[in-house]
């Protein structure tokens, strides 16, 4: 399930919430849906952490470049 695109995982989570809110959804079905939702949430959280790490990395590189450029201009 790890290969599912982030947007698809989020859309499926929304579907699961809708299904679980339906009175006709049985307890067994709700449990299976909950398990699926848990797996999808873990995937989404992992992708978000990776994206945050990448943004942080890019920001640090940009800041290092700016500092380096400032130092070269002052010398």
From Swiss-Prot:
Signal sequence, renumbered to the chain: none
Subcellular location: Cytoplasm
One GO location term (cellular component): cytosol
Catalytic reaction(s) noted: Exonucleolytic cleavage in either 5'- to 3'- or 3'- to 5'-direction to yield nucleoside 5'-phosphates
Annotated keywords: Cytoplasm, Exonuclease, Hydrolase, Nuclease
Any one Gene Ontology molecular-function term assigned to this protein's record: exodeoxyribonuclease VII activity
EC number of this enzyme: 3.1.11.6
Subunit and interaction comment: Heterooligomer composed of large and small subunits.
NCBIfam families associated with the record: PRK00977.1-4, xseB
The family this protein is said to belong to: Belongs to the XseB family.
Main function: Bidirectionally degrades single-stranded DNA into large acid-insoluble oligonucleotides, which are then degraded further into small acid-soluble oligonucleotides.
Record's protein name: Exodeoxyribonuclease 7 small subunit
Organism: Chlamydia caviae (strain ATCC VR-813 / DSM 19441 / 03DC25 / GPIC) (Chlamydophila caviae)
């Amino acid at each position: 399930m790890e290969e599912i695109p982030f947007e698809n995982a989020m859309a499926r989570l929304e579907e699961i919430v809708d299904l679980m809110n339906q009175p006709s959804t049985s307890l067994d079905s709700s449990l299976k849906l909950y398990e699926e939702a848990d797996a999808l949430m873990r995937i989404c959280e992992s992708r978000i952490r990776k994206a945050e790490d990448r943004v942080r990395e890019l920001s640090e590189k940009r800041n290092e470049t700016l500092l380096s450029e400032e130092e070269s201009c002052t010398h």
